[in-house]
């Protein structure tokens, strides 16, 4: 059974280094080989503070853009309100140019509102700030000059150049879980992405909700891709696979119990079967996320998903 019949297959690039040692040689080997194998997209994510040793996504995407030529390059997700929207719009337009129009921009509010205090921002107004960021970035990517008056930003005859390669702009995929956030995604975004920490039953319900809201807004679901990050481990020794997933989730999330609710593990046949089930739920693009033995998983996952 191949999951590629109904879903595109992307993969998380090595950008988290639990042993504390950043291995750029591995990154280079991985992304080049991923493109050779036919993966549709290469992904990173954002976390600024905390325990994980994790590379900055803007810098990382710029780097792998120069190592690849076909695979799309995505982040899932930026906590958008941490960033200045003018500066971020310029950086992302530059990466879209550098990659030849291959950028996907995942954005979200973030799970911890109080995190914004680090940046001198009021967490109580983060939703309004998020909306302004999206509006400003879209305007800067598509208009010259831009005039904008909001609660937080005033732009008077501002422009950025170069504009992105993609027209009208790089796709914005919102990470969203709450009802209001999903409604906002359907109205403002170009796609929706389910978190790696989202169990299948929750994700399934959210997919239905997205489709219902798209119908209400008069939008075609064919033009609104749904993606899902899936943590996984291919190993005939299921106990060992689960143990290693638990160790990684304890490191990254502080929650060793998470894999039993959200991850896929076991033999190649079992992982293939479970990914096919995820595909049937409504995943248009997988962000497959192995958490150890990255290069070995790159090959195994290409085979079991039908890429090679």
Which sequence ranges carry the predicted segments?
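Acidic (Asp/Glu)-rich catalytic clusters
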Residues: 2-3, 32-36, 61-70, 92-103, ...
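N-terminal beta1-alpha1-beta2 module of alpha/beta enzyme domains
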Residues: 1-67, 168-170, 291
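Short, acidic/polar
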Residues: 21-34, 87, 91, 174-184, ...
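Alpha-helix-loop-beta-strand connector modules within alpha/beta enzyme cores
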Residues: 55-75, 131-136, 140, 302-308
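Active-site mouth loops of central-metabolism enzymes
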Residues: 11-25, 78-86, 166-177, 232-233, ...
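Conserved, mostly hydrophobic/aromatic
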Residues: 34, 38, 64, 95, ...
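Flexible, glycine-rich active-site loops centered on histidine and acidic residues
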Residues: 2-23, 81-148, 152, 195, ...
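Hydrophobic faces of well-ordered beta-strands that scaffold small-molecule active sites
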Residues: 9-13, 42-44, 73-76, 103-107, ...
